[in-house]
């Protein structure tokens, strides 16, 4: 492919388009906390908007914010950032944001789900753009505090002001994203690749492969503790090597026996059939069928999600991990 992605870094971006703007961060969970703290530490004016007093409210207060009810945060805001769960955004928009929309306001997303699948259809006189961190919220905060940043994707859906991209990049900079890089994309590309990635590898694929390998060893009579270190705990070290030095760096660090077994057996486990299933999963996202299924599941109170969490919490691998926590923590590097 000849296309080269447009990537922006700190030197291409300025915070100016966000200076003096009143920013409402709706939600104070995984991303909400990271965004509110990073944006505030970057000198921007942030108010946290929440539905009710509770855990998030207390956490925001403990972090030095004075949270407001969602609509009160929105009424005052120039920029509204949606960091409540994807499935909650439609209702929050309809009941707490739409009634207070003014021409020239900005609606900002960290994932394109609600715009791409048309659950939220804003009027044409506001800007709609996205800054999507390519990493979990607590890491977005941790990297920022340590002087780094998690890469982000930026995209513009509506550009009423003519300045939407500059504003997206200003937020990306304040979040720490442009310390690494901000890649320009579309809502469609971000939404589909993010869902495909988390389902097939980041969350679904990795979790199920680790679980399947662990359970296979245990079924064969090996000790759960040995199976846990082999199939779950050591994966971090292997992935860290890939992160730091690429696949070749990882391969240099493991034995020739592991390399040979890896090249031959890996392809038998992750084979054509697995690739066919990956394509099937990706098509289900692209066709909108996954979104339809998730909205329907949410409408029934998310029973499959609750069951998954309950089963994982009780699983032998999770219990074994908890039992080994002390050993794992003792071994963790101290600096
Ligand atoms: N979690 C991540 O690391 C991550 C990464 C990239 C993008 N995103 C995107 O960021 C957005 C926020 O996701 P998150 O995982 O940080 O959310 P989350 O589940 O951590 O959000 C929790 C927050 O939303 C509030 N909340 C929960 N249910 C609510 C409801 N029904 N109505 C109103 N508020 C409610 C909670 O009080 C809490 O403050 C989503 O669009 C998600 O796709 C998340
Ligand atoms: C952190 C992830 C998996 O990358 C994000 O996309 C999410 O939905 O939580
Ligand atoms: Mg996601
Ligand atoms: Mg993601």
Curated annotation (Swiss-Prot):
E.C. numbers = 1.1.1.383
Q: Which GO terms describe its molecular function?
A: ketol-acid reductoisomerase activity; magnesium ion binding
Matching entries from SUPFAM superfamilies are given as: 6-phosphogluconate dehydrogenase C-terminal domain-like, NAD(P)-binding Rossmann-fold domains
Return the InterPro entries for the record. Answer: 6-PGluconate_DH-like_C_sf (IPR008927), KARI (IPR013023), KARI_C (IPR000506), KARI_N (IPR013116), NAD(P)-bd_dom_sf (IPR036291)
Task: Report which reactions are catalysed by this protein.
Answer: (2R)-2,3-dihydroxy-3-methylbutanoate + NAD(+) = (2S)-2-acetolactate + NADH + H(+); (2R)-2,3-dihydroxy-3-methylbutanoate + NADP(+) = (2S)-2-acetolactate + NADPH + H(+)
Binding positions for NADP(+)? 28-31, 52, 56, 86-89, 137
Mark out the compositionally biased spans (Basic and acidic residues).
Answer: 308-335
Domain spans labelled KARI C-terminal knotted:
186-331
Q: Where is the active site?
A: 111
Name the NCBIfam families for this protein.
Answer: ilvC, PRK05479.1
Q: What does this protein do?
A: Involved in the biosynthesis of branched-chain amino acids (BCAA). Catalyzes an alkyl-migration followed by a ketol-acid reduction of (S)-2-acetolactate (S2AL) to yield (R)-2,3-dihydroxy-isovalerate. In the isomerase reaction, S2AL is rearranged via a Mg-dependent methyl migration to produce 3-hydroxy-3-methyl-2-ketobutyrate (HMKB). In the reductase reaction, this 2-ketoacid undergoes a metal-dependent reduction by NADPH or NADH to yield (R)-2,3-dihydroxy-isovalerate.
Give the UniProt family note. Belongs to the ketol-acid reductoisomerase family.
Q: What is this protein called?
A: Ketol-acid reductoisomerase (NAD(P)(+))
Lineage, uppermost ranks = Archaea, Thermoproteota, Thermoprotei, Sulfolobales, Sulfolobaceae
The primary gene name is ilvC
């Amino acid at each position: 492919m000849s296309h080269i992605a447009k990537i922006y870094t700190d030197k291409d971006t300025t915070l100016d388009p966000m200076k003096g703007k009143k920013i409402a961060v709706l939600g104070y969970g995984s991303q909400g906390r990271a965004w509110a703290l990073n944006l505030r530490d970057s000198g921007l004016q942030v108010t946290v908007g929440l539905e009710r007093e509770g855990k998030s409210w207390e956490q925001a207060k403990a972090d030095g914010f004075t949270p407001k009810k969602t609509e009160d945060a929105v009424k005052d805001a120039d920029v509204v950032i949606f960091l409540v769960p994807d499935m909650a955004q439609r209702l929050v928009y309809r009941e707490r944001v739409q009634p207070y929309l003014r021409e020239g306001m900005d609606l900002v997303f960290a994932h394109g789900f609600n715009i791409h699948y048309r659950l939220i259809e804003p009027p044409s006189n506001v800007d709609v753009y996205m800054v999507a961190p390519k990493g979990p919220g607590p890491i977005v905060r941790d990297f920022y505090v340590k002087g780094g940043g998690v890469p982000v994707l930026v995209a513009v859906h509506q550009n009423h002001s003519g300045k939407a991209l500059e504003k997206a990049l200003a937020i990306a900079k304040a979040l720490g994203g442009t310390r690494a890089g901000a890649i320009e994309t579309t809502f469609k590309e971000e939404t589909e690749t993010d869902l495909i990635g988390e389902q097939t590898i980041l969350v679904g694929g990795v979790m199920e492969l680790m679980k399947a390998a662990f359970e296979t060893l245990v079924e064969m009579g090996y000790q759960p503790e040995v199976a846990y270190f082999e199939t779950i705990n050591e994966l971090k070290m292997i992935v860290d090597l890939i992160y730091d030095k690429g696949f070749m760096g990882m391969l240099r660090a493991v034995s020739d026996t592991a390399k040979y077994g890896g090249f031959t057996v890996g392809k038998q486990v992750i084979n054509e059939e697995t690739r066919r299933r990956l394509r099937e999963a990706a098509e289900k996202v692209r066709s909108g069928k996954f979104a339809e299924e998730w909205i329907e599941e949410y409408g029934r109170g998310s029973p499959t999600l609750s069951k998954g969490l309950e089963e994982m919490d009780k699983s032998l691998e999770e219990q074994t991990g908890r039992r080994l926590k002390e050993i794992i923590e003792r071994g963790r590097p101290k600096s």
